[in-house]
Amino acid sequence: MQGARDGRRRALRAAVLAPVAGVLTGLILVVALLPAQARDAPARLHLVTLSTPGTSGSDRSAEELLSMQDAVLSEAGVAAPAYRWTTALNGFAAELTPVQVEALRAADSVSLVEPNEVHELSSTPADLGARTARVPERARGGAGIVVGIVDSGIAPDNPLFADVPGLGREPERFSGACMPGDDWAADSCHRKLVGVSWFVSGFGAERLRAAESLSARDVIGHGTQVASVVAGNAEVSVSAGPSAAGRFSGVAPQARVAAYKACWAAPDPADDGCASADLVTAIDRATSDGVDVLSISVAGGRAFDTVQRALLGAAEADIVVVGAAGNRAGRSYAAHASPWVTTVGALAGPVPQGRVAVRGSALSLVGASRSTVATGSAPIVLAGRSRTAGSALAQARQCREGSLDASLVAGAIVVCQRGGIGRIDKSNAVRRAGGIGMVLTNVRGSARIADVHSVPTVHLGARDGARLVRHLRRHSATKARIAPVQQRGAGARTARWSSPGDPDGAVVKPDVLAAGTGVLGAVPPVTGRRWNAFSGTSAAAAHVSGLAALLRARHRDWSAPTVRSALTTTSAAVRDGTSTLRQGSGRVRRAAALRPGLVLRVASGDYRRWLSGTLPSRSLNTPSIMARDSTVVTREVTNVGTRSMYYSSTASGFDHHRVRVEPAALRLRPGQSATFRVVVAGSDTPRGDSGTVTWRGAQGTTVRIPVVISR
């Protein structure tokens, strides 16, 4: 027995040292070839991925992987690394000189070396695109599922993340812990917030904003907003002062949350971001902890960088990985261009509305409003005519704190001018002075924002605001009423800023679209409020992450690729004239995704074979197709329904190519699989094209597979 163990150790040592010898040789050559200036350059943090699998798809133990890393570090003369990865990735982050970087890149034992970079979060301030308000009303779903949120942390004191009754069954495989930190004890986690971790070595603790917390506590607000949309508790009251905006539930309110803080606040908010070394470490930890869904709303770098390779390791561990496409349309293509990530673009919708009706006149103006309660008839006053003694007229018009005379404002609706201070700060000033409502008017422009205000509020564009002000200047003793407006038939469209897929990419991106403008979410107390609207593909990705949790809870035997297929193939096309590379499969549909009929499954190891080039794209069983002019693409579908079903196929939407499906029809028993081919016949001249292959079941089930044909 001892001899067998010794033999295994000798074999392991030989396996480790054989490729490492190349590192030492490479170091000697690089030192000789690099110019003196480069040899003397300071060390920088780099991410190093070793060539051996070292992922959750490998049977190598963590001990073996660490031994390999030790040998590479030693031979390259690298000091103690900042991070080491053994679950989603086999690699490390370390300070490297240019000499060490080039030597490692030349070594057979190393597959990738890249510098640590800071990525931005994929959201925008609400006023850049807040056009819809969504307060989900579902009270159940996601029981037993843990969603890992890689982001800026979480606000644990918010009632959306409280340990409440009714969370349902306990998670089966999660083993994460509660990492202590500033103002965060090791016992701060519970049945809802099941684990937290934080990683700052890549970003640098010395670069943090003074208000930042060396813990999982969120000060930016982004991570809290995302987590609240994904899995916030059910039926939590949304309010700011006496003004109610209804009740809030996350998409999967019974799901548990694990927060992995890898995004940090800098002194200048423009420098906020997420270092790639911290991101990879967070992904590695989440994979080791055993989350069921992983949500990452970070703008991507290169197509298959270290972050994407770590996400591959997560996918190989049967984790549904959901990523934000990014908000840089016209400047860059969609992030997370990997087939193992469900990449989400954003939908824009109508602004939620309210009406201010002036009594005794025909003046009735509609603007942005999130208020769900009416004020009743009340005096309406101009803020500039209601100022305190000593306050400047400009300050009073903007409803700055202390500028409003309570004797003139109490019980009234106050007309405030936009600018100078925050919009919500204005309604707070009105409330403190005794006002019961606010009309916010633009100085210029028509952009209107539906914020969560402390009094019922309607936000008017400049033209309507000027009409109201002119009327009140002529009629001083006037009453008005604020009330919500019911909207009907307003359709969503692809957000203009949502990043499109690369027409020359390997896979179709984004995969799906979801609501991404003016999405209501919780924010940490440090921001000065409890609720705020946010916009961006991060909001959309949060929605899809919640849907993934619902599917995993409902269908506990479904693999991650099955969930990914169900989300994409049941989506509905958005009829707004945008291309497949803007919307992928289209708008996600919750009810349809729960009953997809047919799914496309990816076999274990196929993603990695595809990445290595040994499996062609036409054979990777993804729920979308990126074709090259004339070609034949093979896909396999499986019936996950409870009865035998007949399906017929169509190929539609193609302008320049002839596309057919063979066979044209399938009959499948429950659990049965079948292969079909998509045959693309080229056009006379090379031209891009797109369309859809659709399978329709006898009971109305629709399975849509988007197809993009590149030139």
Task: Explain the meaning of each model-derived region.
Residues 36-122, 409-410, 436, 640-641:
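Inhibitory N-terminal propeptides of secreted protease zymogens
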Residues 78-146, 153-167, 339, 453-455, ...:
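Autoinhibitory propeptides
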Residues 83, 450-474, 508-514, 553-629, ...:
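C-terminal subdomain of the subtilisin-like protease fold in secreted/lumenal serine endopeptidases
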Residues 145, 274-276, 294-298, 375-462:
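Extracellular/luminal Protease-associated
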Residues 198-209, 393-396, 418, 498-542:
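Catalytic-core environment of secreted peptidases
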Residues 227-231, 235, 423-454, 513-581, ...:
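Hydrolase catalytic cores
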Residues 277, 281, 287, 326, ...:
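Secreted peptidase-domain scaffold signal
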